[in-house]
Amino acid sequence: MAKKPEKEAPAPEGEEGAEGEAPAKKKPPILIIAIAAGVLVLGGGGAAAFFLLKPKPAAEAGEHGEKKEEKKKEKKKEEKGDKKDAEKGAEGAAGTPVIKEGPDGVVFYTLPDIVVNMQTADGKSTFLKLKLTFELPDEETADELTPNLPRLQDMFQTFLRELRPEDLNGSQGTYQLRVELLRRVNLVAAPAKVNAVLIEEMLIN
């Protein structure tokens, strides 16, 4: 009799387990890659946020602060300068002569108002206010007068204080006042010469 073919021996359980587990072993590498990519993304975002939100170095902050302080100081200086210029302009308007061109080449030189306390017989205070304008032949004479203005004002003040109110009464008194003022101003202006003294305003109070 012929022998029955022998049955194939069943494959060991270990081998089947090995074949069944083979596909499962491929999953861990994919998971690791995904986790690594996520870590990189999060790490990159964190680094960007760190650099963006990172406080400026102390040196840069100090320079920025110094620039602000310098701008503030410059602004204050400009404001002070503007204020001083305005004050000087106001002083100039009140204490310097006004020079204007007149007809036929003459120049009008108006002095700041002169106020003096005059003598009176009864001892009462009487004030004289004068607004005087000189008629000059040219601008060069005005240039000669301006530096000597303090001397001229002192000379006028001394002379006017010696006057009494009755000395200025009538046209004769006004004429005599012009003559005396013209003589004195030409003493200061020499060798230049003032043509005339014009009394624009005269008040006695």
From Swiss-Prot:
Q: Does the keyword Cell inner membrane apply?
A: yes
Transmembrane among keywords: yes
PANTHER family found in the cross-reference section: FLAGELLAR PROTEIN FLIL
Q: What induces it?
A: Found in all cell types and all developmental stages (at protein level), the transcript is turned off in swarmer cells and turned on in stalked cells.
Keywords for this protein: Cell inner membrane, Cell membrane, Chemotaxis, Flagellar rotation, Membrane, Transmembrane, Transmembrane helix
Supply the name of the protein.
Flagellar FliL protein
Query: Which Pfam families does the record cross-reference, listed alphabetically?
Result: FliL
Query: Where is this gene product found?
Result: Cell inner membrane
Family recorded in the similarity comment: Belongs to the FliL family.
The function of this protein is: Controls the rotational direction of flagella during chemotaxis.
Deletion phenotype, per the entry, is:
Forms a complete but paralyzed flagellum.
Which residue ranges have biased composition labelled Basic and acidic residues?
A: 1-10, 61-90
What is the source species? Caulobacter vibrioides (strain NA1000 / CB15N) (Caulobacter crescentus)
Judging by the UniProt lineage, the source's domain of life is Bacteria
Ranges that cross the membrane: 30-50
A single GO BP: bacterial-type flagellum-dependent swarming motility
Span list, region Disordered:
1-25, 58-98
What Gene Ontology cellular-component terms does the record carry? bacterial-type flagellum basal body; plasma membrane
Q: Which residues lie within the region annotated Not required for flagellum motility, although mutants lcaking this region swim less smoothly and are more sensitive to O(2) deprivation?
A: 26-63
Query: Membrane topology for this entry?
Result: Single-pass membrane protein
